[in-house]
């Protein structure tokens, strides 16, 4: 019976070995970021576009760009210099492990999506949107998600939205 179930799972395309899909990192990390931002807001009555201020840093080997504001310097994950953490508005992908350059992701990120990132309104009546962008295969197109502290037409607060689907 067990071999029949495993056979059916394999025929259906079920992935029992590889683990979660590659886009899971992005969605899970965006939810973690909103958790950090909500905790920071409860203490400071504001959100921050500086990941270090809210206690966020992606794990080693991250595939994605995490963008907290449409403009500003980003923390690099390679040998090139980065801004001081307190000035950074995001993190680039881990170039050492993934071979993806921050500039490659930034140049392919559509301007209208990049403009979604950042603060909206005056705190404490403000909202924050954070982007996650990366290329999961070897074509020029990106996958882009966002998460926000506000309710949006496509999803309630704290729920990632997939804006560009590359796969």
Regions found by a protein language model. Give the residues of each.
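Sec-dependent bacterial lipoprotein signal peptides
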Residues: 1-12
């Amino acid at each position: 019976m067990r071999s029949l179930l495993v056979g059916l799972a394999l025929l259906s395309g079920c992935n029992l070995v590889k683990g979660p899909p590659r886009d899971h990192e992005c969605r899970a990390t965006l939810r973690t970021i909103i958790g950090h931002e909500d905790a920071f807001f409860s203490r400071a009555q504001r959100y921050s576009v500086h990941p270090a201020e809210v206690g966020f840093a992606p794990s080693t080997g991250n595939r994605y760009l995490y963008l907290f504001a449409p403009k500003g310097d980003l923390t690099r994950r390679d040998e090139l210099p980065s801004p001081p953490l307190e000035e950074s508005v995001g993190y680039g992908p881990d170039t050492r492990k993934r071979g993806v350059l921050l500039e490659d992701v930034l140049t392919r990120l559509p301007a209208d999506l990049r403009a979604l990132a950042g603060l909206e309104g005056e705190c404490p009546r403000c909202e924050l949107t954070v982007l996650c962008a990366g290329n999961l295969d070897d074509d020029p197109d990106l996958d882009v998600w966002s998460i926000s502290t506000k309710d949006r037409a496509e999803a309630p607060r704290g729920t990632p939205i997939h804006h560009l689907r590359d796969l």
